[in-house]
Structures are given as C-alpha cells and as structure tokens.
Amino acid sequence: MAKTPVRARKRVKKQVVDGVAHIHASFNNTIVTITDRQGNALAWATAGGSGFRGSRKSTPFAAQVAAERCAEAVKEFGLKNLEVMVKGPGPGRESTIRALNAAGFRITNITDVTPIPHNGCRPPKKRRV
C-alpha cells in the first residue's frame, strides 16, 4: 500500500515593522543581531563571519559590512523602524549605526546598554606596548 506523500507547508515570513538592533562591539569582534520587539531574533551577522579574520575583524569597516549583511537579511520581514542598543567599547560602534541608517531603516532610538560594574571584578591590567 503506497503512502501518500507528506507535503511540507511553506513557511510564511511574518511581517515585522518595528525591530531592535543589538550591537555588541568588543575590542576583537562586532556582533549585530536584529530582533523583533519581543526579542525573537530575525537575523544576525558578525565581523568574523563576514570574512574578516585576525586583527581586521576588529575594524570599523568589518563592523559596517556585518551590519549591511544583517540589514539585507531582514529586508524580507518588511522592517522599517529600528531601535538600536549598543553594548561594549569596540571600534565598530558608530560605523554599525551608520550602516544601518544607510540601509534604509528609520532609527528611532539609540541606547547605550554597556554593563558598568559597581566596583565588581578587577579589570585586566593596562597594556604596555
């Protein structure tokens, strides 16, 4: 007895108008994640995953390319407005925001959510070059 083929239902992309761009800019890499208002990730990209390795990964240009790739991935969701949350002291902070703005998103709010300790852990020693 032949089984009837099971057809997979086509996934319908949900339409999201407002989103949140989480930018994690460390000294070594930049991670861009775009989520909806509830925090469900729509797309993400990193400077390292965009083809930059080693010290080139920690450049503003690498962060810009990562933001452009992430913006391209969320175009299919119909995203228009972005709220930006920046975390970390890295070199890709500004260039990422500029790239998202140039990609056609309306940036409504920019928030710095860098965790600042109330005298918690001892920081790493200063570099002597």
Swiss-Prot record:
PROSITE patterns: RIBOSOMAL_S11. The keyword Ribonucleoprotein applies. Pfam families: Ribosomal_S11. Gene3D superfamilies: Ribosomal protein S11. GO terms for biological process: translation. One of its GO terms (cellular component) is ribosome. Keywords: Ribonucleoprotein, Ribosomal protein, RNA-binding, rRNA-binding. GO terms for molecular function: rRNA binding; structural constituent of ribosome. The keyword Metal-binding does not apply. Belongs to the universal ribosomal protein uS11 family. Located on the platform of the 30S subunit, it bridges several disparate RNA helices of the 16S rRNA. Forms part of the Shine-Dalgarno cleft in the 70S ribosome. NCBIfam families: PRK05309.1, uS11_bact. Part of the 30S ribosomal subunit. Interacts with proteins S7 and S18. Binds to IF-3. This is Small ribosomal subunit protein uS11. It comes from Mannheimia succiniciproducens (strain KCTC 0769BP / MBEL55E). The gene is rpsK.
